[in-house]
């Protein structure tokens, strides 16, 4: 809220499953989760070690990029921070990719994407017929192949969000980019896997906050009974209800009776989600040699993926208070897959239908997802091709600077 109300220009926060991107989508700001390990987590209270990422919130992509470039460096104090050798491999992979950047931009099948439940039932050409002599460099580089996953096009999506997604893709087609339908089949399992893995890691990480060596000092007047459990009352007083719920859930999934059926299976799903992304990106994972060049010449691969950040506009407090935990977890359905795969993802305010009044409770965020290590491509594309198309000084009104297509 400090960024949204112009109290500060930028802010940082942890993004484990969408905790930076979702607030940004709900407040009309820009929220960026970099690739896992790019920014040091030193000083951050760990929640889920394999998922926690320091993210950035600002009112525009330029400010996000400026802070990211400052923070993007190895920190010996953080064991999850990318080492210089890994950063060098990523840099070299991106440099080689730039040399061949336009080679796979070929005309493919005349496929179309139809949006479920769209008021206009408008179809977007999946392979744009932009003349080949127009494939030249401009502000953000070459024209891109934009992936639209079929699994994100759900019937439960709010009409306002669907229309914003449709208009965003239409604007990109108008600029010369190619829309490519893709499939991420294991996306439907990602949310369930996340809510097994994250609580399991949290139950381990937060166990140390017992008032003995970590946490606030124990108050003798409220300490556990002499013959009772040592930590129960203390932890109950200092952890919120949702945190306690996740600790209990995580402790159960790590138990001998449940570990094989839940935790191990969730780890397998996570690997499948990562594999799905590697299969569709033209830029192979720079730290996984077997994926580095496997897709570079395929006509069905993409440079970036664009999906909504959340399936609904911002929920109201009174609605959240009446939700069950399961209902609240569903809001993470579009942000969790990128977190499981450790990919860079940014949420940016999107244009809603001009026929629907733009009000504070109708903020919509679009999410741009890139391959691991391709953070700057995500930031530059968002800055020049999406943000540059909008009247961003009036981002809260969510209007485009040009007429509707």
Language model regions located:
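Acidic, glycine-rich active-site loops and adjacent beta-strand->loop/helix elements
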Residues: 14-20, 24-26, 152, 212, ...
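A short helix-breaking turn/cap at a secondary-structure junction
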Residues: 33-163, 229-233, 391-403
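Core of folded catalytic or high-affinity ligand/protein-binding domains
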Residues: 15, 98, 123, 217-225
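Short acidic, glycine/serine/threonine-rich loops at helix termini
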Residues: 21-26, 44, 158-160, 191-194, ...
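Glycine/Thr-rich phosphate-binding loops of Rossmann-like dinucleotide-binding domains
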Residues: 20-21, 90, 105, 156, ...
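Short helix-loop-beta junction
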Residues: 161-178
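Glycine-rich, small-residue loops and helix-cap segments
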Residues: 166, 178-179, 183, 189-191, ...
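Short glycine/serine-rich loop segments
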Residues: 1-71, 341-349, 363-365
């Amino acid at each position: 809220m400090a960024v949204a109300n112009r109290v500060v220009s930028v802010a940082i926060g942890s993004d484990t499953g969408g905790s930076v991107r979702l607030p940004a989508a709900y407040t009309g700001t820009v929220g960026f989760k970099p690739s896992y390990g790019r920014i040091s987590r030193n000083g951050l209270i760990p929640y889920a070690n394999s998922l926690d990422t320091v993210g950035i919130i600002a009112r525009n992509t330029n400010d996000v990029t400026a802070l990211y470039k400052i923070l993007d460096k190895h920190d010996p104090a953080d064991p999850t921070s990318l080492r210089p050798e890994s950063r060098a491999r990523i840099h070299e992979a991106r440099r080689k990719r730039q040399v061949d950047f336009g080679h796979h931009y070929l005309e493919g099948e005349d496929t179309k994407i139809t949006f479920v439940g769209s008021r206009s039932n408008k179809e977007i050409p999946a392979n744009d017929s932009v003349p080949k002599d127009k494939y030249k460099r401009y502000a953000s580089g070459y024209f891109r192949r934009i992936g639209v996953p079929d699994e994100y096009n759900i019937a439960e999506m709010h009409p306002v969000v669907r229309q914003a997604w449709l208009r965003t893709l239409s604007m990109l087609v108008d600029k010369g980019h190619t829309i490519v339908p893709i499939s991420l089949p294991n996306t439907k399992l990602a949310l369930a896997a996340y809510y097994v893995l994250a609580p399991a890691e949290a139950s381990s990480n937060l166990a140390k906050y017992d008032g003995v060596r970590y946490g606030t000092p124990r108050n003798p007047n409220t300490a556990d009974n002499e013959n009772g459990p040592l930590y129960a009352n203390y932890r109950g007083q200092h952890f919120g209800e949702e945190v306690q719920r996740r600790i209990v859930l995580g402790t159960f999934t790590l138990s001998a009776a449940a570990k094989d059926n839940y935790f191990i299976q969730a780890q397998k799903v996570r690997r499948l989600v990562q594999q799905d992304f590697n299969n569709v990106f033209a830029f192979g994972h720079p730290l996984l040699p077997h994926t580095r060049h496997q897709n570079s010449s395929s006509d069905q691969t993409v440079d970036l993926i664009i999906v909504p950040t959340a399936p609904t506009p911002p929920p109201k407090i009174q609605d959240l208070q009446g939700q069950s935990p399961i209902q609240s977890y569903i809001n993470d359905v579009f942000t969790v897959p990128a977190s499981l795969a450790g990919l860079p993802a940014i949420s940016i305010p999107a244009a809603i239908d001009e026929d629907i009044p733009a009000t504070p409770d109708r903020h919509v965020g679009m999410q741009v997802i890139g391959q691991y290590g391709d953070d700057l491509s995500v930031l530059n594309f968002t800055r020049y091709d999406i943000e540059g198309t909008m009247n961003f000084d009036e981002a809260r009104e969510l209007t485009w600077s040009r007429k509707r297509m």
